Swiss-Prot record:
GO biological process: defense response to Gram-negative bacterium; defense response to Gram-positive bacterium; killing of cells of another organism
Chief location bin: secreted
Catalytic residues of the enzyme: E35, D52
Alphabetical list of InterPro entries matching this protein: Glyco_hydro_22, Glyco_hydro_22_CS, Glyco_hydro_22_lys, Lysozyme-like_dom_sf
Function, as annotated: Lysozymes have primarily a bacteriolytic function; those in tissues and body fluids are associated with the monocyte-macrophage system and enhance the activity of immunoagents.
Family in the record: Belongs to the glycosyl hydrolase 22 family.
Note: Lysozyme C is capable of both hydrolysis and transglycosylation; it also shows a slight esterase activity. It acts rapidly on both peptide-substituted and unsubstituted peptidoglycan, and slowly on chitin oligosaccharides.
Name assigned to this protein: Lysozyme C
SUPFAM superfamilies xrefs: Lysozyme-like (SSF53955)
Superkingdom of source: Eukaryota
Disulfide bonds: C6-C127, C30-C115, C64-C80, C76-C94
Places the protein is found: Secreted
Amino acid sequence: KVYGRCELAAAMKRLGLDNYRGYSLGNWVCAAKYESNFNTHATNRNTDGSTDYGILQINSRWWCNDGKTPGSRNLCHIPCSALLSSDITASVNCAKKIVSDGNGMNAWVAWRNRCKGTDVSVWTRGCRL
């Protein structure tokens, strides 16, 4: 599923991401835009043999099990396929674990490069939330 901007903002808010660990909703919507272009089915292979999955491009080396990543830790205790669902609950729950891990949203390279330090309120502007 490819989410609309406001549709995704509303879903993320409903699942408790607004100001989770101090990150406003705009940060999460911005991250999703530049990680997956709001597409829940996005997958991208990394040079280390791991794969990033879903709307927030969650990595199989650490966070989920895809059955093909050597030494996978599966810290969210989920199959990576769960992160490709049109229902973003699994992605959001795992993202909460990731952002609580010590580096905050810096865990997402696209957030660090494209969203961090910018006015992320534009990502929720005009949305009925």
